[in-house]
Amino acid sequence: MKITGSNLSIYDVADVCMKRATVELDPSQLERVAVAHERTQAWGEAQHPIYGVNTGFGELVPVMIPRQHKRELQENLIRSHAAGGGEPFADDVVRAIMLARLNCLMKGYSGASVETVKLLAEFINRGIHPVIPQQGSLGASGDLSPLSHIALALIGEGTVSFKGQVRKTGDVLREEGLKPLELGFKGGLTLINGTSAMTGAACVALGRAYHLFRLALLATADFVQCLGGSTGPFEERGHLPKNHSGQVIVAREIRKLLAGSQLTSDHQDLMKEMVARSGVGNDVVDTGVYLQDAYTLRAVPQILGPVLDTLDFARKLIEEELNSTNDNPLIFDVPEQTFHGANFHGQYVAMACDYLNIAVTEIGVLAERQLNRLVDPNINGKLPPFLASAHSGLLCGFEGGQYLATSIASENLDLAAPSSIKSLPSNGSNQDVVSMGTTSARKSLRLCENVGTIVSTLIAACNQAGHILGNERFSPPIRELHGELSRSVPLYQDDSPIFELFQTVRAFVGGDGFRAHLVTHLDLAATTASS
C-alpha cells in the first residue's frame, strides 16, 4: 500500500490492521518530507523563534531554548508525556494509530525527517507494535500521551509487542537491525502533536460499525420470518417519498433477504383475511388480524436507515482527518514560513465518534427489543416461551440470554453520552478547551464490542427459532445462514451452560466466512458503506 498522505480510506486501514498489509512510501512525497525537514533544521540553527523547535511546550512557550539543547528538549518532551495509564490498545488498533501518524507526516508539512517516516513504516511492516496505554489523551494538543508511547519506541525506549510477546524496544530493534531515531529540531513534537491516536482508533471502530450494520440487516430479516411478519413495510414505493437514502437502502436489502420465504405474510392477503373474518357487516368485530406489525418488525428502515446515514457522515469526517495535516506548527515552502495554529485539535473526530456511538447504540437498542419480542410468550406468536424446545418451565431456554442483551443495552446508554462537549482545562489553562476525542473513540471500540454481543445473541435466538419452525421455510439467505450456524450450534434443548452457545455464535458472526456471507447477500453499492 503506497502512502502519500492523501488517499487512505478506513478500508485501507483495515487491510493494514487486520490483514497485515505492508506499506511503502511515495517517493515524491518523501522529497517533500525531506525539504520541510531541512528547512525546519535550518530555522532551528538560525534561532528563528518557532514553537517546539526552540521554545518550551504548552504554557512554557515563552521560554527560548538554545540550539545546543535541541535533542534534549525533544527527548524530554517524549519521556515526560509518555504518561498513559490503563489497559493497552490491541495491536490492530496500534497499527491503525501508527498508520494514521505516518500518513499525516507524509503530507510534508510537519518537518519530520525521512528517517522518522521510514522507521515508522518499518514498525508497521515488521509488526513492531509499541505498547500504548489507552488513558491519558485530552484530544488537544492532539493525542500527546498515546503518541508519546510510539515516539518512545522510535527512540529505542519503552516496550513493544512483537511476535506475541511484550519486550524492551531496544532489544527488538537490535534483533531487527534497526537504528533508533536521533531527534533534531521538532523531532519529538512532530511525532506526538496530532490526532492520530483517536483517528486510528476511530477508523477501526467505524469498520466494525459497518459490519454490525450489515449484521443487523441480516438479523432483522431472520427475525421478521421467525415471527411471520409482513413484507409490506419494506416495499420501495413507501420509502422513496421519505427522501432519505439510508432508509431506501435498508428497505431494499431486507426485501432481498426476505424473498422466497414461506413464513412472511403479504399485506394484500392480510386485508383479504380481515375482510373475511369481519363479514363486512355492521357489527364491531375483533378479527385478530394485524394489518400493521410492531415497530421492531415494521419500522426497521426508519431505524437502521438513519444509522447508515450517520455512519456515512462519520466516515466522511474521520477519513478527512485521516488524510489531513494535524500538526503544529506547520512548515510551508512558499512562502518559506511557519503557521502556528491548532490543527492538532480533535473536535472533528470527537464529534464524529459521538455520532458513531449513537448510531452503534441504536443498532443494539433495536436488536435487544427484537430479542425481547422473540422470547416473550405473550407476543412471540406460536413460538414457545423463551424458545425452550420442550417442557417450558422445567427448561428456561433463552431466558438468561435476554438478561445478557438487556444489561449490555443499558450499559450502552451511558457509553453513548457525548464526550466532545465534556471539556476540562489543563496545561496551565493553555489547553482551556479540549476535544476528548480519544475518549470518544475508545467508547466507540467498546460499544462495537458490546453491540456485537447483543446482535449475535439475537442471531442465536433466531437460529433456535429456525430449528423449531423448520429451516426449510426460511428465505434462501437465511436458510443458508442457519445451515452454516447449525453445524456448530444445534437445537438448544437441555439447558446446558448457554454462554458457550453465545461464544460460538459470536465467533461465527465475526469470522471471515460470515463476512463473505454478508458480501454475497448484501449489495450496498449505493452507499459509501460498501467500499
UniProtKB/Swiss-Prot annotation:
Effect of E399K: Loss of aminomutase and ammonia-lyase activity. Higher enantiomeric excess of (R)-beta-tyrosine
InterPro entries referenced in this protein's UniProt entry, alphabetically: Aromatic_Lyase (IPR001106), Fumarase/histidase_N (IPR024083), L-Aspartase-like (IPR008948), Phe/His_NH3-lyase_AS (IPR022313), Tyr_aminomutase (IPR022314)
Molecular function per GO: ammonia-lyase activity; L-tyrosine 2,3-aminomutase activity; tyrosine ammonia-lyase activity
UniProt-annotated binding residues for substrate: H81, N193, R298
Impact when changing G184R: Gain of aminomutase activity
GO biological process, one term: toxin biosynthetic process
Chain residue numbers at which the record places covalent cross-link 5-imidazolinone (Ala-Gly): A140-G142
Catalytic center residues: Y51
Catalytic activity: L-tyrosine = 3-amino-3-(4-hydroxyphenyl)propanoate; L-tyrosine = (E)-4-coumarate + NH4(+)
PTM per Swiss-Prot/TrEMBL: Contains an active site 4-methylidene-imidazol-5-one (MIO), which is formed autocatalytically by cyclization and dehydration of residues Ala-Ser-Gly.
EC number: 5.4.3.6, 4.3.1.23
Entry-linked SUPFAM superfamilies: L-aspartase-like
2,3-didehydroalanine (Ser): residues carrying this PTM: S141
Keyword field: Isomerase, Lyase
Lyase found in the keyword field: yes
Pfam families reported in the protein's UniProt record: Lyase_aromatic
Extra remark: Chondramides are secondary metabolites with antifungal and cytotoxic activity. They are non-ribosomally produced depsipeptides consisting of a polyketide chain and 3 amino acids (alanine, N-methyltryptophan and beta-tyrosine or alpha-methoxy-beta-tyrosine).
Function of the molecule: Has aminomutase and, to a lesser extent, ammonia-lyase activity. Primarily, catalyzes the rearrangement of L-tyrosine to R-beta-tyrosine, which is incorporated into secondary metabolites called chondramides. The aminomutase activity mainly produces R-beta-tyrosine but also S-beta tyrosine in smaller amounts. Does not accept D-tyrosine, L-histidine or L-phenylalanine as substrates.
NCBIfam families attached to this UniProt entry: Tyr_2_3_mutase (TIGR03832)
Family statement: Belongs to the TAL/TAM family.
Assembly: Homotetramer; dimer of dimers.
Name used for this protein in its record: Tyrosine 2,3-aminomutase
